[in-house]
Every structure is written in structure tokens, then in C-alpha cells.
Amino acid sequence: MSENQDLQQGFLETVKFDEKGLVPAIVQDHETGKVLMMAWMNRESLEMTLERKQACYWSRSRQKLWLKGESSGNMQDVHDILIDCDGDTILLKVSQKGGACHVGYHSCFYRKAKDDLSMEICDTLMFDPEEVYGKKS
């Protein structure tokens, strides 16, 4: 199929979901390009995201749709949705309200390796997860 024919296909038909019906979604800040998180999407969550322009994912642990920010208020307004050349990875460009990470940081990628193989925090703590989600028992 030529690239022009491929572009004429619907976006959803281009996505190659895995055997579990999922596709990885990389989430990037719309203005800075900073990578905020990685999550999984199924067809329903992708359709919802396209329709609402707010990020919705599939929670593998809870086995249900997860509207980002529904508990914390840290919503992701979607500006662009891109697909990679193989059709098996989605890129969402978003405006992040508050922190993207459930442990309170702006990005889930808040730790970096140092030369001595230890780690350091390289991001901003945006909120206290115990205050937002409650204490875990």
C-alpha cells in the first residue's frame, strides 16, 4: 500500500494493537517536548481521547478505562495524537495540569542515573500523593 493510500485510511484502522488489544502511548508536553509518562491504550480509550480531547488510558491493573486526572484533577488536554511508522506506538502531545506522575512529580521520568550508578531526582514534586489519593493501607 502506498503512503498516500495509507494516509487515506482512518487513523484507528492504522493502529496495530497487540494481542491484548493494547498499544503503548508516550505522553509529551505540548510546549516543551518533555516526556511525561507512558501508558497503555485500547481502542475504546483511544476513541474517547480522540472524541473528548482529554487523555484516557486503559489501566492494566484495574482492568478498566482510566481518564487521566479523574481522581487527582491532574488532567491532560490533548493537542495532537501521532502514530509511529510501524503503527504500534502512539504519541500524545498534551497540556498537563499539575503532575503527570501518581507519586507527585511533573513527569514519571523523575529519576536519572548518575555516573556512579546511583540515582538523583531531576524533576519537580507537584503534589503530595497521600493528600490527593489518600493513605494506602
Curated annotation (Swiss-Prot):
The residues listed in the UniProt record as binding Mg(2+), with positions renumbered to this chain, are: 84, 86, 88
A GO CC annotation given for this chain = cytoplasm
Going by the entry's taxonomy, the superkingdom of the source organism is recorded as: Bacteria
Q: What does this protein do?
A: Catalyzes the hydrolysis of the adenine ring of phosphoribosyl-AMP.
State where the protein is found. Cytoplasm
User: Per the UniProt entry, what is one GO biological process?
Assistant: L-histidine biosynthetic process
GO MF entries: magnesium ion binding; phosphoribosyl-AMP cyclohydrolase activity; zinc ion binding
Q: What is its EC number?
A: 3.5.4.19
Kindly indicate whether the keyword Phosphoprotein belongs to this entry: no
- Please list the cofactors this protein needs: Mg(2+); Zn(2+)
Pathway(s) the chain acts in: Amino-acid biosynthesis; L-histidine biosynthesis; L-histidine from 5-phospho-alpha-D-ribose 1-diphosphate: step 3/9
Subunit structure and binding partners: Homodimer.
Q: Which family does it belong to?
A: Belongs to the PRA-CH family.
Any note on cofactor binding? Answer: Binds 1 Mg(2+) ion per subunit.
Gene3D superfamilies from the entry?
Answer: Phosphoribosyl-AMP cyclohydrolase
Q: Which HAMAP family match?
A: HisI
- Catalytic reaction list: 1-(5-phospho-beta-D-ribosyl)-5'-AMP + H2O = 1-(5-phospho-beta-D-ribosyl)-5-[(5-phospho-beta-D-ribosylamino)methylideneamino]imidazole-4-carboxamide
Species whose genome carries this gene:
Chlorobium limicola (strain DSM 245 / NBRC 103803 / 6330)
For this entry, the protein name equals Phosphoribosyl-AMP cyclohydrolase
Q: List residues binding Zn(2+).
A: 85, 101, 108
What are the entry keywords? Amino-acid biosynthesis, Cytoplasm, Histidine biosynthesis, Hydrolase, Magnesium, Metal-binding, Zinc
Q: Which NCBIfam families match?
A: PRK00051.1
